Structures are given as structure tokens and as C-alpha cells.
Amino acid sequence: MGSIDEWRIKIDDVDRKLVDLLNERARYADEIGKIKEQLGLDAYSPRREHEVLENVLGSNKGPLSDAALRRLFERIIDESRKLEREAMIERKKLTSQK
């Protein structure tokens, strides 16, 4: 069964991996934001967000419920969109200063 401390060490390891993966995802979202900006597209893409949620829920094998994963990924998507918009604003500022 293992001790609480052993299980917490495993959770800490998973948390570090999640942070790495979330930051990797954020870098990809930033690159997509650059492309969207070049194409004149908004950071908000409801169709794509729906696809992401469907992909996530389709791969869920538990024990987290679909509702729990939906809430988590809605937040992840929201933060990615915020990052895209902030980066777009920052790039526009840099462009206008030239």
C-alpha cells in the first residue's frame, strides 16, 4: 500500500510533469497565436475549443469524471487564450514603437 509520504512524492512528481506539459502547451498556443495574428484571426475560436474538449473527454478513462475534466480544460483553454491575447497586444506595442 505504501505510506502517505510515498504517495505524496509520487503526486509531487506528477505535478512537476503537469507543469512541464502545461508550459509546453502554452508555448504551442503562443505559436498558434502568432499565426492567428498574421491571418487576422481572433484568439477566441469556439469551434476549436469544442474540439479540444471533445478530444479530452473522448480519451477519459477515469477516475476523473467528464465534468471534472471539462472544468479543468475550460480553465486551461481560458488561460491559453489569455496568453495568446496578451502576446498579441505586446507584439502590437513593439511593432508600433518601431
Identify the residue ranges that each predicted region occupies.
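Domain-level signature for soluble enzymes in the chorismate/prephenate branch of the shikimate pathway
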Residues: 1-98
